Amino acid sequence: GLLEVMDGGTATGVDKKAGGKLIVSTNALEVSGTNSKGQFSIKDGVSKNYELDDGSGLIVMEDTQAIDTILDEHATMQSLGKDTGTKVQANAVYDLGRSDQNGSITYSSKAISENMVINNGRANVWAGTMVNVSVRGNDGILEVMKPQINYAPAMLVGKVVVSEGASFRTHGAVDTSKADVSLENSAWTIIADITTTNQNTRLNLANLAMSDANVIMMDEPVTRSSVTASAENFITLTTNTLSG
């Protein structure tokens, strides 16, 4: 079964069983109960120590927050607000700065994530700011999307640590000017934003450290049939320091 508790809703004493699906918004007045991971509670716009199990979803709305959230296998989280200490486990999916509720998509440049750990899970950054993130494991992915129309580019700040075969991908001119990127046995793929005119995808980086790692620059992996034959699309990466 499916239980959705959205803006202004209340649900207490929830007992989520295997196979059930629970979708919760931090704009709910109060949600509490148990799942396969133990007790959880969301109240007054704050989710704290919530471990989402299989089939669970959390939507962090603007001006609300989630603290120390764990996304287990196949759980999802969409954040338009602030989250701190989120852990994204295998097969879980996290989205920053974007929410899709029943086909209605909302973006937010105010979204912020701090001190995230991605362990074989996936995090998509659509808008907002990600501060200090580590991603590891062969199935671990951190993907930063190209700037959305009418929204500032997504920003990476502080340490970005990619290791143990994980993948780091950026599309177009995202803001990495305040990021210290460390690649260990991993790869960073920088994907140009293809247009019909000449365009230089420029990335400025505070520092880049590499150990048994690769930085790959490429066009969007799509057909160029709509791109003018004479168009030149290229990538420029500038870093204050390069080591490794």
Task: Name the predicted role of every residue range.
Residues G1-L3, G9-T12, A18-K21, N27-L29, ...:
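The right-handed parallel beta-helix/beta-solenoid scaffold, focusing on the short coil/turn
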